[in-house]
């Protein structure tokens, strides 16, 4: 089914879910501006213009954008990166 963007109660956050496991185990991973992660997919998402922070857990990644950025192009870029990683 690929990557599925899903709205969240926060208009500045979208949850991107996949049928495949992205992160093993029961720990969540958060990356804030200026941080890096051992998970390259999160680092690549943080490089996108307009991304404020990312949160990953098992089969999803939630991307939080800056309030003044529109989702239109950003959703396409997030899905593209996740698909490049095989999700």
Language-model features: locations:
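Conserved short beta-strand edge segments in small beta-sheet-based binding/regulatory domains
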Residues: 84-87
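Short amphipathic alpha-helix segments
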Residues: 33-47
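A generic structural motif
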Residues: 14, 59-65
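Short acidic amphipathic segments
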Residues: 45-60
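Charge-rich, low-aromatic oligomerization/scaffolding segments with amphipathic character
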Residues: 70-82
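Short, surface-exposed beta-strand-loop junctions and turns on beta-sheet-rich folds
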Residues: 22-23, 69-71
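Glycine-rich, charged/polar anion/phosphate-binding loops
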Residues: 1-3
């Amino acid at each position: 089914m690929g990557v599925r963007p899903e709205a969240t109660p926060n208009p500045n956050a979208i949850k991107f879910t996949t049928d495949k496991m992205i992160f093993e185990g029961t720990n969540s991973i958060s990356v804030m501006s200026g941080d890096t992660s051992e998970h390259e997919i999160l680092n690549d998402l943080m490089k996108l213009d307009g991304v404020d922070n990312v949160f990953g857990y098992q089969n999803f990644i939630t991307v939080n954008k800056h309030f003044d950025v529109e989702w239109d192009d950003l959703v396409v870029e997030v899905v593209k990166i996740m698909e490049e990683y095989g999700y």
